Amino acid sequence: MINVGIVGCGFVGGALKVWLEKNNSEVIVLVSDPPKGYNDDLSKADIVFLQIHVPTEDDGTQDLTLMKELIKGLPDVPVFIRTTILPGTSEKLSKETGHKVYFMPEFLTERTHIQDFETQPMVFTGELDLLAQIFVGKTFCYMTSLEAEITKYAHNVFGAVKVTYFNAIADYCRRLGAEYKRVHAGCLLSGYINDTHTYVPGPDGKFGYGGKCFPKDVNAFAELTKDIPLGKLLAPLHELNVGFRGFEERI
């Protein structure tokens, strides 16, 4: 049996817990999240998955104080961080805590997190033999933790870019008296463009992007890359989104 520790049982940790309990009878799931009533002892864990809130400031910095404290208090086993962290953070945490720290990105949507975890492939960044025993039957791709950290930001920020682009197209249609729904349908005809993040307004009934992830990830990534071409591409996103997000208040 493999003892799998889960620190933080929000929708990310919760989806992992549900999948393991449903799909792998050779795993014992140990959960630590006192506010939610989970107080399992992680001292016998063979591996730990860590998903906690990490504050991201407007200047792109992250407060890793709590994460460091939690890692230092864990047994000497591989630790996989599933919280979005800036590129290079897992290597930094490995050096500062003395633990083997990896990053394993997640691409779950909060309202469909259980289904998403069930169907999505995974990214493995280390301890392949152990992960293969835990995630039996899961399709995965391998990369370094640094590459995975970049992947997570590239994925999330592209979603924000796509939302912003199609909001700009919808704005252009309004200005010219064209029907955005028809333009939107025409853009999807070739099959080259996936319809995700192309609806205006979005699933929340609002213009622009919102939620817990896109705003903080855009701001952090734009600040981190401000002196290179990528940052120049991302710099206008926040201001544009503020304008689109407030559009429903003006109509």
Language-model region placement:
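NAD(P)+-binding Rossmann beta1-loop-alpha1 motif at the extreme N-terminus of oxidoreductases
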Residues: 1-43
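Rossmann-like NAD(P)-binding element
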Residues: 38-78
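Rossmann-fold dinucleotide-binding core
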Residues: 52, 78-152, 221
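Conserved beta-strand termini and adjacent loop/short-helix elements that scaffold enzyme active sites
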Residues: 30-34, 102-106, 143-145, 186, ...
